[in-house]
């Protein structure tokens, strides 16, 4: 109540403005608001107009860009392609025209003269080789060379390897010589396998395996087998060759010869009754044990006999 009395008291009511002044103030306020709104709307209209002009300019720029690109395409792609097509068509028409002229020329002269066949013709009247003399490539078909991509890639690899070989060794060689050298290297890298039942004994190994003559050996081999083992690879027949194929061939030859001689000795022993043959056992374990132990005994006897043979040869040379 105290607050209301302060604002609405008789003294305060006298200080209030009159009605005319209030209406004037309201009118001025409305004018100010209208001016502010007009300014805002004017700015919005200006911005909208500028945006419209910008978008129109952008559309025109894009259209112009498309026109320029189309012009460049027509100048660089379409016109040259069309010109080539026209040249091809014109050349084809010219070829057809020349063919037609030649055919008319042939018909005219055949109508004037008699029938032409074989080698009987008059070159003054009609020459069937007229076009070949005029154009040496007339009637010939040119086939482009076949290019295999795998073959080309292999040639490139060979050339690279040859260049590396020349750079490392400093020797110049042709591609054929380089391939021959590569083949020789591959053959040299191959391991020297023996394709016979017994391994070949070198000159140094019999010394290690050699035993004195009076020593006793516990082996179950017959005398015929010992003779075969002694005759296998005699030192005076073995030749050290650098060719792998030659050594393999010699080993096969010696092994086949030894097998034939062993069969002959066995047949002779059976005929004379000297060979002691035990009947084959039906037990699986005994047969497997005999098969496993047999090549070991034969190898030991082979090394021993070869060592004795080498010692005898050395004594004979002395």
From Swiss-Prot:
Q: Which residues does the annotated region (Disordered) include?
A: 259-297
Q: What residue intervals traverse the membrane?
A: none
Taxonomically, which superkingdom? Eukaryota
Family under the similarity heading: Belongs to the FAM228 family.
- Name of this protein: Protein FAM228A
Query: What organism does the record attribute this protein to?
Result: Bos taurus
Species lineage:
Eukaryota, Metazoa, Chordata, Craniata, Vertebrata
> What would be the name of the gene that encodes this protein?
FAM228A
